[in-house]
Every structure is written in structure tokens, then in C-alpha cells.
């Protein structure tokens, strides 16, 4: 049997607050790696505390990629991510380093590892027209429009998901073909690397819930609300007619903080809503991860040795991936 000569990469996956960042840093330091963020919140400048973005010492210790690519009033698509990530991975491999893909955005992982259908490129004029319509009839009204021209896509997209509604209508108006028909086409080429997928997930849901609450409280102690207030004060953000529809503001925690600062309820209510929203995100992430049949699952506290053995075994047949000195 021929030897698989593709470069190796490790994908550190899992629900929010499961310890992905710590594992990615540890693995990068031990196995001479660089980290490629697979997180839709970390691409936005100004989202620091609430997004648990790696801080300056972490970035100094290990090179990080795909952070701070866009301003918070801008949009960044999964297709753009896949293109940028492929380039970053190729450059890491060319340096003789190990790419470590770390994050919890399932759509980004799918776009990168499996490829996306070749959808029409974004048209800012069409997007602006759709956004203007949303101001008149609301996103629910636009969702109803989508249901008439593309019932398959409308059934998959919630009426409160403006980004996906806008994209589906944009594709239809540009091409005359429903986005569901485009998505049924064969995807583009897969990533030309061999990937070990490791999922960090506590076995008991209560443990994950406790980690989520603890992390939110730590973020509040670091002045998360002040961070959101500073985002709100940016002139470009104030110029946005519906900031809650922006992908950056829709990031978990930020939306609830924005609404609280708008005067919707007290601090305790904000905390409860943010925790509940984060739990719901974790549940969706776990549901998606269960579909990754080639992934290996580990409890971040109980399975440290098994996790290490899995990575060592995966890397064993590639001596070109060098360990950092002294490890």
C-alpha cells in the first residue's frame, strides 16, 4: 500500500468553553506548530474579551493566523475563510511547521475540510438593496420572499438569521438560481492535508455548563461590558441602521450585552441570557460534531493521556514534523 505523503494537521474542535485554546497552545509549543483560528468571532477587530481572543503573550509564544481580519461592521464569509485558511496552512507547511486548526465554528471547518459549492460572489449593490428592504418589511418579510423562490433554503434558514437570508436572496437575485440548487452541486476540492480531528467535550453536561458560567463571570470581571460599550461608540457602528444584524454583534454574549446596554433588563438578567445563549451555542456545536464520524472525542480533564497518545501516534510516521527543543 502506498504511503500517504500528504502533510499533517491537527484540528482541535469542541463546544465553547471546552479548553480548545489551551490545548492548541500546548500542542503548538510541543510539536512546533502554528495555530489557525477556526472561529467566526475572532476574525473581527475589537472583539477581544467576549470572544476569548488569544492575548499578546499567547500570540508571542505561538504564531496565530486569521485573527483580526475585519472591522466589526464588516462581513466575512465561510468561503473567504476557506481561501485564507488554505493559504495560511500552505505557508505553515512550507516552514516545516505543524498546522493546528482550533475553533468551534462548524461551517468554517466544513468549508475548509470538505469544500463549498461554487456560489456567485457577493454583490454589494444587491446586498445593500436587500438590507434596505429589511428596514421596510423586516427580515421575517424577506424570509417569506425566500420561501416563495427557494422553499428548500427557507426551510433550513431561521427567520431570525439575517445574514443567511440576505445571502440566499442575493444569490437568487444575482443568478436567477436558488441557493439550494447551487449547494446541491459538487463541492470544490478538499484540503490536501491529512487531519486528525480531536473533539474536547466534558462527558457531563453540567461540567460544561459550569465552565460556561465561570468563563462569562471572568469576562465580566475583565470589563467585557466596557468592551461592548467601546464598540457601540465607534462612529462606523453608530452609522449602521441595524447593528444587531451584524455578524460581529450576533456573536454569543455580544448580542446580549448590546441589548442590555440598550436598556433591556438588568445586569442579572443579562448574565442569565448570555449564559443561556452560550449553552444553546454549545448544544448546536455538539450536535454538529456528532456528525463528524472520523473525529476522536476526549474529556478535557479525564482523557489527557489518551489525547496525548492519539496525537503522538498520528505524528509518529512523519519525522519531518519537529518537536520544539527541550520537549
UniProtKB/Swiss-Prot annotation:
Residues 39-42, 163-167 are annotated as: Interaction with substrate tRNA. SUPFAM superfamilies: P-loop containing nucleoside triphosphate hydrolases (SSF52540). One of its GO terms (biological process) is tRNA modification. The keyword Cell membrane does not apply. Substrate binds at residues 16-21. InterPro entries: Dimethylallyltransferase, IPT, P-loop_NTPase. Its cofactor is Mg(2+). This is tRNA dimethylallyltransferase. It comes from Xanthomonas euvesicatoria pv. vesicatoria (strain 85-10) (Xanthomonas campestris pv. vesicatoria). The gene is miaA.
Amino acid at each position: 500500500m502506498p504511503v500517504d505523503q500528504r502533510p499533517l494537521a491537527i484540528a482541535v474542535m469542541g463546544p465553547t468553553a471546552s479548553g480548545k485554546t489551551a490545548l492548541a497552545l500546548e500542542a503548538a509549543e510541543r510539536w512546533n506548530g502554528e495555530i489557525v483560528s477556526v472561529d467566526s468571532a475572532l476574525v473581527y477587530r475589537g472583539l477581544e474579551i467576549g470572544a476569548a481572543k488569544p492575548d499578546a503573550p499567547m500570540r508571542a509564544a505561538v504564531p496565530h493566523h486569521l485573527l483580526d481580519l475585519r472591522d466589526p461592521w464588516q462581513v466575512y464569509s465561510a468561503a473567504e475563510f476557506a481561501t485564507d485558511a488554505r493559504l495560511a496552512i500552505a505557508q505553515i507547511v512550507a516552514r516545516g511547521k505543524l498546522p493546528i486548526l482550533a475553533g468551534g465554528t462548524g461551517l468554517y471547518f466544513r468549508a475548509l475540510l470538505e469544500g463549498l459549492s461554487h456560489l456567485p460572489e457577493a454583490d454589494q449593490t444587491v446586498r445593500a438593496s436587500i438590507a434596505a428592504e429589511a428596514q421596510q418589511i423586516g427580515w421575517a418579510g424577506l424570509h417569506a420572499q425566500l420561501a416563495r423562490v427557494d422553499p428548500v433554503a427557507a426551510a433550513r434558514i431561521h427567520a431570525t438569521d439575517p445574514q443567511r437570508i440576505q445571502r440566499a436572496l442575493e444569490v437568487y437575485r444575482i443568478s436567477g438560481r436558488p441557493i439550494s440548487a447551487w449547494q446541491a452541486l459538487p463541492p470544490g476540492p478538499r484540503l490536501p492535508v491529512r487531519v486528525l480531528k480531536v473533539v474536547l467535550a466534558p462527558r457531563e453536561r453540567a461540567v460544561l455548563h459550569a465552565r460556561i458560567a465561570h468563563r462569562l463571570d471572568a469576562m465580566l470581571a475583565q470589563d467585557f461590558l466596557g468592551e461592548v460599550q467601546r464598540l457601540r461608540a465607534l462612529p462606523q457602528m453608530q452609522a449602521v441602521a441595524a447593528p444587531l444584524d451584524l455578524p460581529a454583534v450576533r456573536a454569543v454574549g455580544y448580542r446580549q450585552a448590546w441589548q442590555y446596554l440598550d436598556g433591556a433588563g438588568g445586569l442579572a438578567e443579562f448574565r442569565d441570557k448570555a449564559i443561556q445563549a452560550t449553552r444553546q451555542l454549545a448544544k448546536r456545536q455538539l450536535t454538529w460534531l456528532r456528525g463528524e464520524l472520523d473525529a476522536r472525542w476526549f474529556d478535557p480533564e479525564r482523557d489527557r493521556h489518551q489525547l496525548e497518545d492519539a496525537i503522538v501516534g498520528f505524528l509518529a510516521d512523519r519525522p519531518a514534523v519537529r518537536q520544539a527543543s527541550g520537549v
